[in-house]
């Protein structure tokens, strides 16, 4: 794109039109710019437009944003993105112009160009842009001399961005080369501008300097502190060790001085606090990483920070300062210099002057509780409050307890008693004191290793529960003091394993009652408490503490209240309520009396969310709830299946007909579950869906593939006769061939193939086997992966145990005569020992045993070595310790908070396919192995011990002897 008057007019008009509120000119302009972006020198032309003073600010700002985004996508595009990169000659011109243009721009445009410069720096600095740092330093020094702090701050902001990588990237030689270059060139100019600005602040402050003078100076110091953090993050540089006294002296001054001219306004106070918070980050880093070098400054900083915290108000605008300052004291408390806190009454004073004020509820907390219950729960129950005052203050106590556990326990216990006494004196006025006491107990409890159980030294849990928590839970008014109710429910949830079962059973009706609370937090906490109680394991036993019979007396009321709670404003898609529904349905006895209202309630919600799927976690638990209800109700009473179909089919058909992308994988999994529960013959509704499965269009979205495979397996299992009609099996195998050809879907292809082998007669599949083997062997030659190799071993094993070694060898030989020996030697033997999972190990071990004991080609004397090596692999497989083979699956994996519909596939745990053991009659593959080899050897005495001695590893020979002894079988 050539830079001329015509280009200027074209681009400026386009950028102006992108700001239009009218859709048509806006879209036309966006398309024109998108097309122009493919031309060489487009980025350069846009940058020149940004610098054109004749163009209005609004248009130039739009151009600056476009320039930044253009660089993001095209400076260094991913190799497979298909986006054409900016050419090197254009890059060099942009790098030559951008610094000077950024510094001369207005603040809004300067901000965009600084970000654009950072994009370039991320890829090119310093190696491919050696001129950048000298140019920044020269401009910084010139701007400082001129007192131009707009430019100073622009340069420091840019430097802060390009140096930021040193604070988060892993230590590598390349990173340290870059860091050394930056330190060698920038550490001295940084110190110079920091000290110069500091003297300007001192001068302005002493003469009553006005906010307009002080504001850019304080912003400059904050930026210097962020750069200091990045440059000091990896190691303590020699330069900063030599100049530590100057830096620490200034840091201490800003933490201990007041600046009334700025602090009298909220904006000015925020500016000062941001600098102080950045300083606290730096000294906290020094105490953690450079403790020895920093120790001379430690006492003064601890004293200054403590004093500062006493004066920091509860205003949310001061939260960042409060949390970073408390973090510093926490780091000191766990360091070797913790003796600073050993003095008389020090811990008591910290508790009273720092911890309690920061743990106590604020008006802002109450507002979040009432106005944004999801955010409140995330902070309070789910731990996203990691940087809130409440959490950080409790972390300080935990830090102190590292070395002074007895003193901390005594002080906090007394403080809890004081708070509770205050509440008792006037409950309606002092309810926040009780909330504070409960919060302290819950937050300072420690989780025991390897489980959800928690413990605390602050209180006797059962005593505290009976006297402090229980009265709240037994309150007849579920809507009074909702924050206290929520705190009490949280306490019960946290200490659920401590509450004896008989006591907890008396509480269940109270929890059911709290589901009717109007507060979204309270009914969410009640649901969460019930859900977590149902997961409690009985100590010393494998099962859960609470079973179906425990829920029966109040099950109907529980389900009614859960569904009613979903009608409260803003709880229509409450994930905690839906998760509780899912958990209860997974435990309770599902009679027809319960199943009817539940399926009605769930399908009503399902039809509603189909209109606008927006909460992936809620929707996942909704589908899990449907799946568990269908599974458990129909296991108990198969006659319910038709009623469930009547209820569910309208929603499932809506998902399919409207192509609701987010729900298609769930819909296919539910349909698979319904197909599996049916008895032959399947209704026409299902067969219509089966025909949809055969359409290539259905398989185009990768996220649908696992669910479609699951559904196809269900049809192969339940309607094998229908599947083989009208050339349908050929279409199914076409799907298999497409899936197995790709490493990303080959496992899914094997699921289909294995299901065909398990459910169709050999006479039906025989005509297709040459094509199947050809597809598999082609894949072996082209893209061999460990996953594919294991899947193929399992498939060959399944074929053998279902249809016999003769048919296995015969069908393989249609591809190439006598291929079986090559497959055994080069593929089966090396990959057999990779198999994991108890059922898979049994299947492959038994199949391999039958292969060497029944296959003529392997029993031939010329194949003795092959026979021995295969036996060696079998012994390796069956001798491996059980824990190496497979890990226990959790009952139900937790759904991640960031689960989304863009994920490839989200499995429904409760609609999972039941794995059938194809070898139910064989209990022990080890016994089968030695018995089979023993029988074989008895027919040819003396032959096999020699083969074993020559071909088995010594460890496997020993293992085989041990197995023979264990099962009383000999090898003659």
Swiss-Prot record:
UniProt GO MF annotations: small GTPase binding
InterPro entries in the cross-refs: ARM-like (IPR011989), ARM-type_fold (IPR016024), Importin-beta_N (IPR001494), XPO2_C (IPR005043), XPO2_central (IPR013713)
Alphabetical list of Pfam families matching this protein: CAS_CSE1 (PF03378), Cse1 (PF08506), IBN_N (PF03810)
Chief place of localization: cytoplasm
GO BP annotations, alphabetical order: intracellular protein transport
One GO cellular component term: plasmodesma
Protein name: Exportin-2
Organism field: Arabidopsis thaliana
């Amino acid at each position: 794109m050539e830079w001329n008057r015509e280009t200027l007019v074209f681009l400026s008009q386009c950028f102006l039109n992108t700001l239009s509120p009218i859709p048509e000119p806006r879209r036309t302009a966006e398309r024109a710019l998108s097309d122009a972006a493919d031309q060489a020198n487009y980025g350069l032309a846009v940058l020149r437009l940004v610098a054109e003073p004749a163009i209005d600010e609004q248009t130039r700002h739009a151009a600056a944003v476009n320039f930044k985004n253009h660089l993001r996508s095209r400076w260094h595009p991913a190799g497979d993105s298909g986006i054409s990169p900016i050419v090197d000659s254009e890059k060099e011109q942009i790098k030559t112009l951008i610094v000077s243009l950024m510094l001369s721009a207005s603040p809004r445009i300067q901000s965009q160009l600084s970000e654009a410069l950072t994009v370039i720096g991320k890829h090119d600095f310093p190696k491919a842009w050696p001129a950048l740092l000298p140019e920044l330093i020269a401009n910084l020094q010139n701007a400082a001399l001129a007192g131009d702090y707009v430019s100073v701050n622009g340069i420091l902001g840019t430097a802060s961005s390009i140096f930021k990588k040193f604070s988060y990237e892993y230590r590598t030689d390349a990173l340290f080369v870059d860091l050394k270059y930056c330190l060698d060139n920038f550490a001295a100019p940084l110190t110079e501008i920091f000290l110069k600005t500091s003297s300007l602040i001192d001068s302005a402050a002493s003469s009553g300097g006005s906010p307009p003078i002080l504001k850019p100076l304080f912003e400059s110091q904050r930026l210097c502190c962020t750069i200091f953090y990045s440059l000091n993050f990896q190691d303590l540089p020699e330069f900063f060790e030599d100049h530590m006294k100057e830096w620490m002296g200034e840091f201490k001054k800003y933490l201990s001085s007041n600046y009334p001219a700025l602090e009298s306004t909220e904006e000015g106070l925020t500016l000062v606090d941001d600098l102080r918070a950045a300083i606290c980050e730096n000294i906290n880093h020094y105490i953690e990483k450079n403790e020895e070098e920093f120790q001379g400054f430690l006492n003064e900083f601890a004293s200054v920070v403590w004093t500062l915290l006493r004066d920091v108000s509860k205003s949310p605008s001061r939260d960042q300062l409060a949390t970073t300052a408390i973090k510093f004291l926490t780091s000191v408390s766990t360091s070797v210099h913790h003796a600073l806190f050993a003095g008389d009454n020090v811990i008591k004073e910290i508790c009273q002057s720092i911890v309690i004020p920061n743990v106590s509820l604020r008006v802002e907390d109450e507002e979040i509780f009432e106005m944004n219950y999801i955010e409140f729960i995330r902070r309070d129950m789910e731990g996203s409050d990691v940087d809130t005052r409440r959490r950080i203050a409790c972390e300080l106590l935990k830090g102190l307890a590292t070395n002074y556990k007895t003193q901390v326990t005594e002080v906090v216990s007394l403080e809890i008693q004081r708070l509770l006494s205050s509440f008792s004196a006037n409950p309606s006025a002092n309810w926040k004191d009780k909330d504070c006491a409960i919060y302290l107990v819950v937050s300072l409890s420690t989780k025991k290793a390897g489980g959800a159980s928690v413990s605390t030294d602050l209180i006797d849990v059962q005593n505290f529960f009976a006297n402090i928590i229980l009265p709240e839970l037994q309150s007849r008014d579920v809507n009074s003091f909702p924050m206290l109710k929520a705190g009490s429910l949280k306490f019960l949830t946290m200490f659920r394993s401590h509450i004896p079962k008989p006591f907890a059973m008396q509480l269940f009706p109270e929890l059911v009652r709290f589901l009717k609370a109007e507060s979204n937090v309270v009914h969410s906490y009640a649901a969460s408490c019930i859900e977590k109680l149902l997961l409690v394991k009985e100590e010393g036993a494998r099962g859960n503490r609470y079973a179906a019979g425990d829920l029966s007396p109040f099950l109907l009321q529980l389900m009614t209240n859960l569904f009613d709670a979903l009608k409260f404003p803003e709880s229509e898609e409450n994930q905690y309520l839906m998760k509780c529904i899912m958990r209860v349905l997974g435990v309770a006895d599902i009679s027809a009396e319960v199943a009817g209202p539940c399926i009605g309630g769930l399908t009503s919600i399902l039809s509603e969310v189909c209109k606008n799927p927006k909460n992936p976690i809620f929707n996942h638990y909704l589908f899990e709830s449907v799946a568990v209800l269908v599974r458990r109700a129909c296991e108990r009473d198969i006659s319910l299946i038709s009623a469930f179909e009547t209820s569910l089919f309208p929603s499932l058909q809506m998902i399919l007909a409207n192509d609701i992308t987010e729900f298609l994988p769930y819909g296919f999994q539910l349909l698979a579950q319904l197909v599996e529960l049916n008895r032959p013959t399947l209704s026409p509704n299902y067969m219509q869906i089966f025909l949809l499965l055969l359409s290539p269009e259905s398989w185009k979205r990768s996220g649908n593939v696992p669910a479609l495979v699951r559904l196809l397996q269900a049809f192969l299992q339940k309607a094998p006769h229908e599947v083989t009609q009208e050339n349908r099996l050929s279409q199914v195998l076409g799907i298999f061939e497409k899936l197995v050809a790709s490493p990303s879907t080959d496992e899914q292809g094997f699921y289909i193939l294995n299901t065909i082998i398990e459910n169709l007669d050999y006479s039906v599949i025989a005509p297709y086997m040459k094509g199947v083997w050809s597809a598999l062997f082609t894949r072996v030659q082209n893209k061999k992966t460990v996953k594919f190799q294991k899947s193929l071993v399992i498939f060959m094993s399944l074929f053998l145990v279902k249809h016999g070694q003769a048919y296995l060898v015969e069908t393989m030989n249609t591809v190439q005569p006598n291929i079986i020996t090559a497959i055994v030697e080069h593929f089966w033997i090396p990959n057999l020992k990779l198999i994991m999972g108890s059922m898979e190990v049994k299947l492959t071990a038994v199949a391999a045993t039958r292969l060497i004991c029944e296959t003529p080609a392997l029993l031939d004397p010329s194949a003795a070595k092959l026979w021995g090596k295969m036996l060696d692999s079998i012994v390796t497989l069956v001798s491996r310790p059980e824990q190496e083979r497979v890990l226990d699956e959790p009952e139900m994996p937790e759904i991640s908070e960031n689960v989304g519909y863009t994920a490839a596939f989200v499995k429904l745990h409760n609609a999972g396919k039941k794995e059938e053991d194809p070898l139910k009659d064989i209990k022990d593959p080890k016994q089968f192995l030695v018995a089979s080899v023993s029988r074989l050897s008895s027919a040819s005495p003396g032959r096999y011990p020699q083969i074993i001695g020559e071909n088995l590893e010594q460890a496997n020979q020993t293992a085989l002897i041990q197995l023979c002894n264990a099962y009383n079988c000999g090898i003659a």
